[in-house]
């Protein structure tokens, strides 16, 4: 296993945001991945991350919902807020038992002000649209976010799971600092169009689920140990008919990591880190031991030949099963109507 080393700093985007080269995805501490971690343990893990140099913290108002932001508010007391880069998101809500995506100006403003109150901060460093509302022209949504920047309520604007054309349209209204997207050895479809677009426009890339939602940490046995209320049990890639095939990738990565003297998770995470200094993966965990291992991935150095070998093992399309459940859209269906179609309420 590669030992944890110092966490370097990187510039995210072109507007001046500086973050730790690896972030902490906080979702699993409160939501979706089984029983939430006890609050005192969750806060201790967040503080350990910050003390270790992982200062880029990622949350959302839908995690819980809302309880993850409330957890962050407690973790950031007593001067801790000044040590971190805080990212949260809006745009997904539960309404009458259904998932809804919202990007109209009134909702954007109300969501931002609610997050500011919950996290108990004066300003959010990076505020993402979590999923694109395909009923609202993206120019309208970004226009309201631009006002929030001007009012000092948010510093930088981000998008999540947006298509290349949506990114371009948004960026024309106000500079987009970061795109959050799933990117890992088993989710490489973003490399064709999304990543080149971000790089052309100077937009940073925040890679969520860089360990394949834990797949590269445990392989197929991960599923056996999941709580019944863990959302991963419903994901297509974790269904047995797909898992029987997908485990081949884990076995090959595991064999390569053994030669490299690191864990499979560290090797998979190092691959993401080696994509460039404009990329910040945000692995999540509920265990300090795993957090230390994730930081250790920063010290795993891969040669061009090793990168090529990993990419040959995990060619786009190799993994079976969709990466998301159908109710959560991805960048592939995130186009919005033309601005000319918009009639304000």
UniProtKB/Swiss-Prot annotation:
Transmembrane segment boundaries: none
Organism: Arabidopsis thaliana
Gene Ontology cellular-component annotations: nucleus
Binding site for NADP(+): 209-219
Any Pfam family hit: Aldo_ket_red
Keywords: NADP, Oxidoreductase
Active-site residues per Swiss-Prot or TrEMBL entry: 63 (proton donor)
GO MF annotation: an example: oxidoreductase activity
Keyword Cell division included in the entry's annotation: no
Protein name listed in UniProt: Probable aldo-keto reductase 5
Lineage: Eukaryota, Viridiplantae, Streptophyta, Embryophyta, Tracheophyta
Group of enzyme by EC: oxidoreductase
